[in-house]
Structure formats: C-alpha cells, structure tokens
Amino acid sequence: MSRMVDTMGDLLTARRHFDRAMTIKNGQGCVAALPEFVAATEADPSMADAWLGRIACGDRDLASLKQLNAHSEWLHRETTRIGRTLAAEVQLGPSIGITVTDASQVGLALSSALTIAGEYAKADALLANRELLDSWRNYQWHQLARAFLMYVTQRWPDVLSTAAEDLPPQAIVMPAVTASICALAAHAAAHLGQGRVALDWLDRVDVIGHSRSSERFGADVLTAAIGPADIPLLVADLAYVRGMVYRQLHEEDKAQIWLSKATINGVLTDAAKEALADPNLRLIVTDERTIASRSDRWDASTAKSRDQLDDDNAAQRRGELLAEGRELLAKQVGLAAVKQAVSALEDQLEVRMMRLEHGLPVEGQTNHMLLVGPPGTGKTTTAEALGKIYAGMGIVRHPEIREVRRSDFCGHYIGESGPKTNELIEKSLGRIIFMDEFYSLIERHQDGTPDMIGMEAVNQLLVQLETHRFDFCFIGAGYEDQVDEFLTVNPGLAGRFNRKLRFESYSPVEIVEIGHRYATPRASQLDDAAREVFLDAVTTIRNYTTPSGQHGIDAMQNGRFARNVIERAEGFRDTRVVAQKRAGQPVSVQDLQIITATDIDAAIRSVCSDNRDMAAIVW
C-alpha cells in the first residue's frame, strides 16, 4: 500500500512538472521549459512525453533518446490528458532531421543516434524491428537510416544495395530524404571506384536554380529537387562529392569548379577546402573483397590488407599452383637435369621452411638463383614454372614472374640507379623477378670497365638480395660464361645466388619434338618425310660452328628455331595449297594441315638465311 502511494505521488509530482513545462514552453520557450521537463522525468522516469519534451527543448543526450524509446509505449498519455501535442526534431542521417511524435519515429531517430555514437550493432538490431514500419511515411526514413549506418561504417556495397531498394507503392516519398539517400549512394560508389555510377546518383538530385539533371531519368527512378538554402549541409555535400568524383575521373577542371561550390553560407566546408588545397587528394577506394574480409563487420580497420587477401587467395590455390608449376615444367621437351634440380630444390625449400618454423639456422640459403645456358633452351618457361612452384609452396605470394631489364634498375645519371633499384625491389617483395641477359645490367667501356650507373644498380641490388633473402626471388639468366664474368664485378655478388641451373642445347631429336608440339595445337602436322628432313637439317645445324665459335643450334636459338621453322613452313604450305586450288585440283582438310618435306626444307633454309652467322653452312 505504501509503495502504491509513493508511485502515485511520483506520478502526480511528475505531472505537475510536466504541465508547468508545457505552459512555460508555450509562453517563454524551450530553454525555460527544459528544467521542468527534467524534473518530470526525475520524478517518473517512465513518463515518455516528458522525455520527448526534454529532447524537443534541446536535450541531445543519447541516454535521453534511449529512455524515450524504452518508454515509448506511454507516448501521448500526458499530452492527451491536457489536450496538447508535442514533437521533437531529431537528426536522422548526416544532414536532415525527422519530426518525432510516435514510437516508431523514436526508434528510427534512435537508430541514427546510435550510428553517430558508434553503437553500430545496436543500430542494426533496432532497424531489423519491422514495427518501425508502421506507417507509409516511415519506409523512406528507414531506408535512409539503414543507408546511413552502412555509410558511417564504410560498408559501401550495402549503402548502394540499400539505396537501390524499391519502396512500396504506398510509401510517402520526401525530396529531402531522397536527396540524402542519393548523396550517400554517390559517396559509396565513389569509394568503390565507380565514378560514373556516383555521377548517376548525383544527377538524380536537382538543386533548384542550379541544375536540372534529373530530367534524363524515367518515372521509375526516384529523383528530387531541393532549394539551395533548404538544407545547406546537404547541398554542399552534393557539390563536394561531385567534385571528388570528377577528380577520380581525371577531370580536374570540373573538380575544381564543383569543390568551389561546396559552401555553407558562402564558406567552404573543411573537406572542400582541404581538397582544393591539394589536387592529389582523393577519396580512398576499396573493393567488396576487402570489406567482406573484416573480422568486425562494423570496423573498417579490421579489414585485411591487399597482401593479406592475396596470401589467403594463394593459400587456397597453393595445391593447384604447385601442380600447375610441376606440369608446366614436365611438359618441356628434354631438360632432364633441370627437372631433377628443381625437384631437389623443392625438397630443400620444404626442409628450410620446417627448420625456420623450429628456429633452426638456414645460413647461406636464399631464394635467388641463376639459370644459365644458350637462348631458347627453356629458361623463361622454367622461371614461369618456378613462379607457380614457389607460390604453391608459400615462398612467394604471387605466381606471376615479373620480367625486368637494365632500364628498370638504372637511371640516366649517377645517383639515380640506387633509389630506382630499391624502389623496384620494394615493389617486388612477394614476387619473382626474372632478368634474361642478367649481365646487361652493366655496360662496358672501351677498356672493359663497367659503367658507374650500372655498378650503382649492382651494388644496391647486392644489398637488397641479402636483406630480402626470403622475401622475394630474383632469377638471373643468360650465357654461363657471360654470367660468370658479370658476377666478378662485385666480390659479393656470386654469394647471393646459391643455386645455378644449367640448360644444355637441345638435341636434334628434341628440336623436332618441340616443332611437333608447337604445330599440333595450330592444327598443323608434319608428315614422316618432313620430320626426317627436319631431323637431318637440325643435325647439320647442330654440327655447324659459326665464325664466332658458337654452335649452330645456339646461334639459331634452339627452341625458338623450331617454332620459327613451323611458322615459316606453314607459309610455304599455304602458298602450295592455294596454287593447288587455282590449278583446279581439290583441296582436302588434310591438305590444309600437312607440312611436307618440301615445305620444311624451304622453311629451314629461309630461317637460317636470316642469320648471317649461318651463311657458310653446307646443306
């Protein structure tokens, strides 16, 4: 009985304060009325109308809005009692406010306040409550509240999907809300690097007296027209994001114009001022994969870096990459010693990783290696296979090799090559760099001494190869004698490579086999006589020594020679087949494919005639 009396007394006290607050609000204004509304809620914390009064009179405390939401079932009890109405304007989204009178509107306003306060999960849970959609006016407000949550948490794809949702036909559409949603969607598209999509969203909003871009849309697309002074913050934001989108699209003149329009009462917004001061300033662009990688869906800082995502992708593909690398190497004609060496290298790398895991030393080991031998013997293809094998074993992140040359290391003047080499290596961490004719990194003066620009690159490369023994893989290739000579330009250079794979010249049988394998997917076939002529000719070439002392097959670049011969032979075949057709003779499918002995002989002589070192060969 005593508790009931106390409760009744609290209610009566609260009502006296509430009634006084409403009277004062009408006569003296909100500032004077606020203390009475506060006193009412202190007397009866469940008095929802008093909480609404506090908020209407300027109480912006999140706790007050939470209390109003908690007791919103009691809304209108006191205002109905005294025959009055009460409403509060509460921010919803970045730049406009919702007029709160009912419980569902309180929930929508609270979701926005929770978003601003960083209580994202609570905002999300509140927006999942379908009771917020108890009136047709609330549907578009709900769409804005959800888009705003996704905007603040930088879940850009979700902003776009929310903004693109169709409203029910009965939903009440408000220009200010439509414009706000379009602005958020434009930001989202821009942050995803979709500049043209962003402009599409921006064009849906007309600023009266300034633009009429919305006329290009059909009736099925929601558009809006707002006055330049109606919502200054929103108008400024629309100009700002349009300017940043034009900058993203490399249209700087337009960017400057629109950024200059991002003003409130004639004063540039801070964001626009910063962007105008620095033409290199751009919106941060990300992608759906990065956003989806977050460990906390609401926290952008928990997303994985591009390297981490690449690592994850590589980890998923490692088995495939390892198999692809092995298959690529196995398909190469010959190279028995190289294949055996790569197999042994795999074993060494696997043991090295196990030793590192257990803290055991791996002194003298490195990823870097040399591939030496004549041109056309499969060095580049082997490097490609190693890229897949290394990635499959987790030694590097990226299976693709990056082919480089002297110009990637060397500048035009002394002092430029060191920094350029450092930059190249830093960008190549986690990758494989492949440089054919490795020795071309330096150029020799007439007296045989290396040039200073090249030596600067060599000396810096030496440091990087040691510093990053396991962070990337550098593969140098070329003739063995020239590679060995090059390694002497710096005493420490040879020690940076602990493995050398030797590639031998192809045998005549292997050259013919390479030609056959090259022809097959091109729907070309060598008949038996053509293969015999090919073999005899390659044997002659192999036994020939050029004036410079080079084996003929090396001068003709081994496997490349086989491919060149097939291509040239196809040309002779085509000429022969056309003559056959013009003579009135039928041409079969087989005729279109077969390369004859005559074709191959003419092709070999033609290819060899392109090389002056082969001029003295006797067929």
UniProtKB/Swiss-Prot annotation:
CDD domains: AAA. SMART domains: AAA (SM00382). Disulfide bonds: none annotated. The keyword tRNA processing does not apply. GO terms for molecular function: ATP binding; ATP hydrolysis activity. Keywords: ATP-binding, Cytoplasm, Nucleotide-binding. This is ESX-2 secretion system protein EccA2. Shows ATPase activity. Could provide energy for export of ESX-2 substrates. The keyword ATP-binding applies. It comes from the Bacteria. Gene3D superfamilies: 1.10.8.60, P-loop containing nucleotide triphosphate hydrolases (3.40.50.300), Tetratricopeptide repeat domain (1.25.40.10). Part of the ESX-2 / type VII secretion system (T7SS), which is composed of cytosolic and membrane components. Residues 522-619 interact with an artificial EsxB-EsxA heterodimer from the adjacent ESX-1 locus. Its main location: cytoplasm. It is found in: Cytoplasm. ATP binds at G373, P374, P375, G376, T377, G378, K379, T380. InterPro entries: AAA+_ATPase, AAA_lid_6, ATPase_AAA_core, CbxX/CfxQ, CbxX/CfxQ_RuBisCO_ESX, P-loop_NTPase, T7SS_EccA, T7SS_EccA1-like_N. Belongs to the CbxX/CfxQ family. One of its GO terms (cellular component) is cytoplasm.
